[in-house]
Structures are given as structure tokens and as C-alpha cells.
């Protein structure tokens, strides 16, 4: 466990759109980290890299060049394929996100077709993860890493779009239960 100051931001009430938060992160997105040097990090991966350098005992991003490369590769894959697909589905169907289909300070209309495509992409990515986890305990190594965290959070987030892990995908299901 690391000890850093945190502040909760109430997304349900759009607190991230308030002036105080916009001054910290004009993109109006979470998470965000303000470093000791007052630099702003607003992407999860950059925050993790910063924290791992500050607290090297964490070692979730790998200990060798090979392991680091594999972990970052999978994190980027999960971000660009699974998280985006879930976001497309959720942000283009949720009544709470009407006119907020994309994060940030500007409003964007929902496009229902993107939700349909997003759901199909989620199903396809489940197949990829299931194959990748076949006969393995973890995604990138013989131990729990940031790649497992990224994938777990994304797979768990599919509950928001009511897309469960299919029963036949035992590799993915077993891994999900193991890391939960």
C-alpha cells in the first residue's frame, strides 16, 4: 500500500465539470494525479508509471525489459479495444450521458450505432482474452501485474452494459474469479 493524498470526485453529479476541477485537468476526466513537482498526469498508465517510479517496491509494470514490454503492450490493447468498446456502448445508450457521448468539456450527441458496434467488440475481445488465458493463471507473467489489473477493471466494467462473460469462456471466467 502506498500513502498519497486522494480526493473523490462525484462523477454522477458531474463534479469533474466544475471550475475547481477544470483548473487541475481541463480535459475534465478522471483519474488525475498532481505530482510533487505539480505536473499533471491524466492517463491511468502515466499515473501508474509515475507511481511505480516513486514506489519501486510495487513492481506491477514488470522487472525486465521483456516483461515491461509485454505488460505495457497488453495494457494499451485493453485500453484501445476493450475500454473503448465498453465506453462506446455505455456512453451512446445511457440516458445519464445524453449529449455527453465523449468525455471532456464539450457536449457530443449519442450515436446508437456505436453502441451496437461497441457491444460486438466487447464480445470479440472476450474471445481474445479467453484464448490468451488458456492454461495460464495471469495475462503476462507467472504473477499478478498491471496488465491483470487493467483487464480485470475492463471486464468488470462490462457489467455496466450487462455483457457477462460467456459460460463457455472458462479461461477468462476462471482468471476473473481468481483475480477478483
Label each region the model flagged:
Residues 1-116:
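GST-like domain detector, emphasizing the conserved glutathione-binding G-site
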Residues 1-4, 162, 180:
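Proteins with a high burden of low-complexity, intrinsically disordered sequence enriched in S/T/G/P/A and R
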Residues 22, 69-72, 150, 173, ...:
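Generic structural signal for individual residues within well-ordered alpha-helical segments
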Residues 81-178:
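GST-like fold's C-terminal all-alpha helical module
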Amino acid at each position: 500500500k502506498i500513502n498519497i493524498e486522494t480526493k473523490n470526485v462525484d462523477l454522477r453529479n458531474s463534479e469533474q465539470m466544475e471550475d475547481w476541477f477544470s483548473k487541475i485537468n481541463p480535459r475534465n476526466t478522471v483519474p488525475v494525479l498532481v505530482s510533487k513537482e505539480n505536473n499533471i498526469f491524466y492517463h491511468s498508465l502515466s499515473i501508474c508509471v509515475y507511481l511505480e517510479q516513486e514506489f519501486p517496491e510495487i513492481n506491477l509494470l514488470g522487472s525486465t525489459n521483456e516483461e515491461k514490454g509485454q505488460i505495457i503492450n497488453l495494457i494499451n490493447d485493453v485500453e484501445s479495444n476493450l475500454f473503448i468498446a465498453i465506453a462506446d456502448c455505455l456512453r451512446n445508450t445511457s440516458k445519464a450521458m445524453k449529449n455527453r457521448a465523449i468525455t471532456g468539456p464539450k457536449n457530443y450527441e449519442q450515436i446508437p450505432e456505436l453502441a451496437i458496434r461497441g457491444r460486438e467488440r466487447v464480445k470479440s475481445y472476450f474471445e481474445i482474452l479467453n484464448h490468451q488465458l488458456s492454461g495460464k493463471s495471469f495475462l503476462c507473467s507467472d504473477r499478478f501485474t498491471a496488465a491483470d489489473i487493467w483487464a480485470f477493471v475492463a471486464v468488470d466494467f462490462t457489467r455496466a452494459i450487462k455483457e457477462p462473460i460467456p459460460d463457455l469462456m472458462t479461461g477468462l471466467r476462471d482468471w476473473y474469479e481468481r483475480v477478483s
